[in-house]
């Protein structure tokens, strides 16, 4: 993929001292999510802090995905990447979407950016629960996100706890549409899809647009605890006021956090500098990416399936965040 110059990103405040004379320049390739998405903007802001503090650093930011980023780190194609905690757990265990454990990965920081699973049906579908789909063998027409996406995987994990598979849905006469979220939203608007699924932070613009045209219902996840234990998701809740009150009531679901992972063979000094830039430049980062405001140094070092990089651990311990 084409590497994008960080000089195009918003200029941020200089932090830290210049790199000492004689030290090796920092050279990094960073993989985020889609261009202009939350992780792309947030990781871009962190990379800009590094280039500001170390003018001779060579840092490139490229788009990526939850599934491809761990493999790129294992293959030494990238040095640091954004990753959801639940997919990191799959990488550690070697479970779907991976065929075996993914190596050469350590954690840098848990950003604790909340991404909740939206399971949304048209109100006129008559569907009120996931249990009802199983009991009545409803021929569900569902858009669970692109094939292999974290949205589809999380949705499948939830369905499996209810004793439902995608093959079951097809056997009952339903259809699985792995179109992009915009297409599926349009299909739901036209009555071609009963359910739209999305895992992400806040209110997705396409769901906001859909809710303005079609009455919707968010289905609760009652099997959240079982899913959490297996896949390192957590039990979350949508406030009733979301989507201009269309949510109607607080609705239980599952969610995941965003984290930063790095190569295991990254030098301790580089991992230390990345952690320092993130922690000491926090205000600059969240100015560029408000969704990362959940990040705090006090909690950044735990809650991740991969062990912490020794360089990051050194910073957290030096500053007293980690005892």
Model-derived segments and their meaning:
Residues 190, 195, 200-211, 218, ...:
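An extracytoplasmic/periplasmic, membrane-proximal ligand-sensing/linker region
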Residues 27-53, 57-58, 116-186, 190, ...:
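Bilobed "Venus flytrap"/periplasmic-binding protein-like clamshell domains
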Residues 7-16:
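Bacterial N-terminal signal peptides
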Residues 17-23:
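Sec/Tat signal peptide C-region and signal peptidase I cleavage site
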Residues 74-116:
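N-terminal segment of the mature folded domain
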Residues 1-4:
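Positively charged n-region of N-terminal signal peptides that target proteins for export
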Residues 41-74, 246-250:
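Extracytoplasmic small-molecule ligand-binding "clamshell" domains
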Residues 85-87, 95-97, 103, 125, ...:
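Pocket-lining segment of extracytoplasmic ligand-binding domains
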